Amino acid sequence: MEAFPVIDMEKLNGEERAPTMEKIKDACENWGFFELVNHGISHELMDTVERLTKEHYNKCMEQRFKEMVATKGLEAVQSEINDLDWESTFFLRHLPVSNISEIPDLEQDHRKAMKEFAEKLEKLAEQLLDLLCENVGLEKGYLKKAFYGSKGPTFGTKVSNYPPCPRPELIKGLRAHTDAGGIILLFQDNKVSGLQLLKDGEWIDVPPMKHSIVINIGDQLEVITNGKYKSVMHRVIAQPDGNRMSIASFYNPGSDAVMYPAPALVDKEEDQQKQVYPKFVFEDYMKLYAGLKFQAKEPRFEAMKAMENAVNLGPIATI
């Protein structure tokens, strides 16, 4: 079994830049995931974010989760549950407008730490997008511009805790899915594992590493690269012991950004491979995704292509 790709970002600044870029390229094409170390975000900040997030769960979220479990009778389930996940979550929005000040129950130091962490992640996401541009042969800044829309990209964070589960064989922490958006940056618990990705028909553990950031490719990067980079199915396995923390930040296109394969990449393709993916508004894709998240991505792309064809075949407006 190949080793899970771990990228040391410090190596991008010296003689090992070329093999490191090749490793990123291989990860994007064949894994859809890679793990970053020496990414420039201070360990002290990450430790603070982790401590405050776990304290917040214990103080404000744990009892609510236990009440939900009791209400739904989940501790006594005898058959597989396919319509919910064993997770406790809340969401933060950073771009286009932050809502961190509006989230109830967050201590002021937690708000401050999450805001600083999000700012660092935003810069890291944009740095990574330029590395992906370089690897695939697009001009620097292309992916950021493609995500822009009229108000810039959207950027938000899903803060999750996965408590100990009495029946992990019957309930997933998070059911298998691909991510709808652009590039995802995950700060995960380094003690309790659970994240897995699907590669060559097998579920592979994403290894928990202290102070690393796990990166994965969303559906929109697959579209823009015309399939060169792949979003892959992943899931979270609930665990009988330990509470797993997950802070996933999603750097996505703006809601009105128009997604389509980069012409520079399409032009290089053989005729039959010219444009495999449709052209659509990101918000329309998200509406479709909301109901089909836990299904394969290909029917979503086909549905968007059908919508595109319907628009193209429609009457021409005259004024």
Swiss-Prot record:
Cofactor: Fe cation
Key words, A-Z: Ethylene biosynthesis, Fruit ripening, Iron, Metal-binding, Oxidoreductase, Vitamin C
Binding-site list for Fe cation: 177, 179, 234
Pfam families listed in its UniProt record: 2OG-FeII_Oxy, DIOX_N
Domain Fe2OG dioxygenase per the UniProt entry, residue ranges: 153-253
Keyword Ribosomal protein applies: no
PROSITE patterns cross-referenced by the UniProt entry: FE2OG_OXY
A GO BP entry: fruit ripening
Chain segments annotated as coiled-coil in the UniProt record: none
Reactions listed under catalytic activity: 1-aminocyclopropane-1-carboxylate + L-ascorbate + O2 = ethene + L-dehydroascorbate + hydrogen cyanide + CO2 + 2 H2O
Gene Ontology molecular functions: 1-aminocyclopropane-1-carboxylate oxidase activity; L-ascorbic acid binding; metal ion binding
EC number: 1.14.17.4
InterPro entries, per the entry: DIOX_N (IPR026992), IPNS-like_FE2OG_OXY (IPR044861), IPNS-like_sf (IPR027443), Oxoglu/Fe-dep_dioxygenase_dom (IPR005123), Plant_2OG-oxidoreductases (IPR050295)
Pathway: Alkene biosynthesis; ethylene biosynthesis via S-adenosyl-L-methionine; ethylene from S-adenosyl-L-methionine: step 2/2
Record family assignment: Belongs to the iron/ascorbate-dependent oxidoreductase family.
Protein name: 1-aminocyclopropane-1-carboxylate oxidase
Species of the source: Actinidia deliciosa (Kiwi)
Gene of this entry: ACO
